[in-house]
Amino acid sequence: MKQVNLLLMSAAMTLAACGGTKDAGQAGVPLIERSNIKIEGKRMTPEALWAMGRIGGVAVSPDEKQIAYTVAYYSVPENKSNREVFVMNTDGTGNQQITRTPWQENEVNWIKGGTKLAFLSNESGSSQLWEMNPDGSGRKQLTQYDGDIEGYSFSPDGKKLLFIAQVKTKPSTADKYPDLPKATGIIVTDLMYKHWDEWVTGAPHPFVADFDGNSISNIKDILEGKPYESPMRPWGGIEQLAWSPAGDKVAYTCRKKTGLAYAISTNSDIYIYDLATKKTDNITEENKGYDTNPQYSPDGKYIAWQSMERDGYEADLNRLFIMNLETGEKRFVSKEFESNVDGFLWNKDSKSIYFIGVWHGETQIYNVDLAANDKITQLTDGMYDYASLALAGDKVIALRHSMSMGDEI
């Protein structure tokens, strides 16, 4: 694997050997690990594709010297996957697998000044938040929430936890007919009753809780009593929620509709919830298409998000917008690009934004200079597609794939 200019390293493609591990799998529980498949005659088969690990989210340590990421391995006979955590230096050296368990470690993030790694795991029987040392030792469960935690984000000061969990929004068949406890049928009276292969029985809600370093308390459902989704199905995750730099507000994405109106509309909005006053403001009410994925600028003066203009048009142009939080002025900052913005990240100085966009069949990384009339500069080139952005000093960390290789860092 060779280094390229923008990337700091090229992570081993998960068919190659990795470093030492911690916390071996539990006895009696199948452990899905890296496959040792051999490709004969240079033929790419379905089995070879499933043998490749899939790199997950990348998190940079606060001192910007290390990267934590996950890799998912697959078992065709078991029809399951398992995700493990790896840590490496930002120059690509010292790559080590730090977990080796059947418990699906995922959504890894650095916490407590970089002394711990937070992650989700189903080791306790449900998806809960855990922490461990950066070498994989000292696993400790942080939450005992009654249900699965599907995503999370700590406030900038680390004293509060924002997390996603399902809430029940409609009665089940068993609720309606308690004398039929074994009934498995679904009673459908309205849309949406299904997303792809998942029946809709509830909605994901954002919760905020106090965190003392060991456990959470004072849990508050931001959408308590409401039938709405935040993040939105079927693909939304923690990227649709954001802390303000001061940790006093949460921005969230929501389409506040139900039934048929929900099913035929793409009119979602960005809402800002004030933790102190419990007041919610809709900052994109005038726009009728998708508004998603809010991000505050590091200096707290602006908020950016992705926006589509027209309601009901899922293939509309995905634009990058910013709003001045003091004046309320909004600006379409990717107008010069004339294509979709697929993801973005504020620069540390709050004066520019990195984004990923498709142009002529390639997904490249760009920078829009907000102080220079939104001038857009293309930073990468070649027959590749980039995904996921993070910053480490003056470097951009990204995932990259092509027709001949899977995602690498």
Where do the protein language model's features map onto the residues?
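Short glycine/acidic-enriched loop and turn motifs that connect beta-strands
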Residues: 73-77, 123-126, 168-171, 257-260, ...
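Predominantly five- to eight-bladed beta-propeller fold
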Residues: 25-32, 83, 166-225, 253-256, ...
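C-terminal motif of bacterial Sec signal peptides marking the signal peptidase cleavage site
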Residues: 15-17
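Residue-level detector of Asp-centered blade-edge/turn motifs that repeat once per structural unit
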Residues: 62-63, 112-113, 156-157, 245-246, ...
